[in-house]
């Protein structure tokens, strides 16, 4: 089996990041190239890991389900910036597959991959699908 370019996208909390990191390690062990999209919270969680086994793309993201019109507008703008950044990275080096692990930072990369015709897989570790994975 030849090595594949596999991108992953995960929210900025441990419940999203650490399952994604486990999949990254398994994919790397099989010789695949991996990249992980997350927000600055996820990057901060991973900052303490020496020899991080994945290329990290930190994108802008926020929940659009906040209270207050101004917060929703700002969150929508952040998601838009995350989508543009995702379009740049995914369009530049088309992955063979994108795996989403939920959380708002995963929404834009997964959506962009889907729009570009990249096959998408979703990993849901909870009993019910979250908003981003739905």
Task: Outline where the language-model segments fall.
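Gly/Ala-rich phosphate-binding loop of Rossmann-like dinucleotide-binding domains
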Residues: 24, 28, 114
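An aromatic- and histidine-rich active-site surface loop
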Residues: 41-46, 95-116
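Conserved nucleotide-sugar phosphate-binding/catalytic loop shared by glycosyltransferases and other
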Residues: 3-11, 28-78
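Structural detector of well-ordered beta-strand residues that form the stable sheet scaffold
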Residues: 7, 35, 98-99, 121
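Short beta->alpha connector loops at strand-helix junctions that form conserved
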Residues: 58-62, 101, 122-126
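A short, glycine/small-residue-rich beta-strand->loop->alpha-helix junction that serves as a flexible
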Residues: 8-21
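An amphipathic, basic-hydrophobic alpha-helix
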Residues: 65-97, 107, 115
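Active-site-proximal region of nucleotide-activated glycan assembly enzymes
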Residues: 2, 33, 41, 53-55, ...
């Amino acid at each position: 089996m030849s090595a594949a370019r596999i991108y992953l996208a995960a929210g900025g909390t441990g419940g999203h990041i650490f399952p994604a990191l486990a999949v990254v390690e398994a994919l790397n062990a099989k010789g695949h190239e991996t990249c992980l999209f997350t927000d600055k919270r996820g990057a901060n969680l991973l900052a303490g890991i020496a020899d991080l086994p994945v290329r990290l793309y930190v994108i802008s993201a926020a929940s659009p389900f906040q209270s207050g019109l101004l917060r929703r507008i700002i969150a929508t703008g952040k998601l838009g910036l995350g989508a543009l950044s995702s379009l740049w990275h995914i369009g530049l080096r088309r992955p063979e597959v994108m795996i989403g692990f939920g959380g708002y930072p995963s929404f834009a990369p997964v959506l962009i991959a889907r729009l570009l015709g990249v096959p998408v897989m979703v990993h849901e570790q909870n009993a019910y699908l979250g908003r981003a994975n739905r």
